[in-house]
């Protein structure tokens, strides 16, 4: 049990280790192992030579720090060990090997049993590690020659061996047994004279003489200091080799420089070409990578636009996305836009006057699918360059100019790329708009609303009464809002309150850009609501007011004094026709409102209300009339801006209009009532006759 523990601890391994080490070798001290483990900069070899019994082994032990042993035990083989030594002014780790050299070794065979007989041949046959076997001066840095000052033959050995030492190796002649100086035979002066008269070539290394005593460690310090000479020589040789290597490196570098001077690397023109090629190589991936994030950012922008379509009317989402697409690539487009939006409204007004409202309403939806295909083709073919990159900035913009909206509404196939994309994302919008168009198409639509719409019709038809009674207070409220609007709209807004039907319309198209398009750019919602509410005469008036050209004509007529009432009614119908929502559910009392409108349109009660309205306008709207003349000179851009602001303020006008309608109901006019009664009797019979008369009236105008 205890033996096993000892084996684990390793206490019994030390003696075994000594047994395994061959003769003449020993294990290195642990301290030296740790020191040399860090790295050795210099390896220095010191050789101790001398005749027998001169104290070589004693010196070898003393250098290791061991005690002096008085008994003489002849050394059989060369012994080598490492000692602690370092140069005083350097931190370099120096490994000093000390060799105890035996000139003639004797190898004794150690047997396990008793020696039975002498065998001299066997002893001679075995080889020993001695000076005869190997060259002890090879790679030697210093030599220590020892002799006994009490024995002359030991000094003769020194005289024989000194010539064999290489000339570059320093030698220290050490006279041992100084403790027995009373028996000395060799004097120090004799030794110095011999060393001085040795025949050595010039440049040979140094010879030094000293005396020592291994018994009391005398002369060891001197010997330690003597080791500085072989170390410094070794360091010098090392540095010289480094200097040679350094010089060789310098020469090689000079050759490389001379060769490189002739290569293409030193040609400036070639260098510039390489730089240009690198710049082009770096620029091409940057452009592709710059486009990829834009296309990636496009995906999140489209869904929010579809969400906004749900909140607004079906036609509103399309123009919101279109203007930004046109603005960045083609800035001159806005200048060319004004003539384009004017043409579609004229065609729609004429068509509606002649009773072709369903056709006009149905016409716009079909061309929209074709742009969708074009947009999809564009996106598929050009994947890297997406023109929709501008949507990122446009989606965050607050408003869209009314001019752009009109222009975009007029150019369905050209600029409807983004619109088609948004509808492709939200197909419910297109379906809902188709339903509205289908409801607008049937011409017999005014017949069912005759019963339900009277509430709306009464409020809308009594605009003339509102001009007299409630026109003044409303004008004070609405005038500041409509200041930048065109002349015709400003006079109408001051004289007349906005219709109540505009309230639902303004609620949805609250975004300013879409609302502007709802009023002027898109005629579909206007026609749909007018058809649902009553006869086509109201539609005709609404579209007449929508057309900016017609407004200018009505202004000229208003100067004559014949058609101020008609213009006011057209303004009021225009406001009524604005809503984008699908047709409201039928309500009773529709014929009363439409009869009043028809009477105004067809001239049954036209003269008296016209005079009263003109007188009221003279009282209330004199300054606006002058402003109208001045503002007529301004371009259509101002009208578009006014239309845009009109959409913003519709809520306030709707509220004021509700009050005006109540007052109109309370105090109707006698002369108008008679004419309106006749119109009710006439229009109650059939709606188709209304549009014909309305068309004739429009031609007379």
UniProtKB/Swiss-Prot annotation:
Biased composition, class Basic residues, residue ranges: 643-653
Query: Where do the record's region annotations for Disordered lie?
Result: 279-701
| Location(s), subcellular | Nucleus; Cytoplasm
Q: Where is this region: Interaction with CDKN2A?
A: 629-667
Question: For bias kind Pro residues, which ranges apply?
Answer: 316-344, 580-589
The source's domain of life comes to: Eukaryota
Q: Which GO terms describe its cellular component?
A: cytosol; nucleus
State what protein this is by name: Rab-like protein 6
Its source organism is: Bos taurus (Bovine)
Encoding gene per record: RABL6
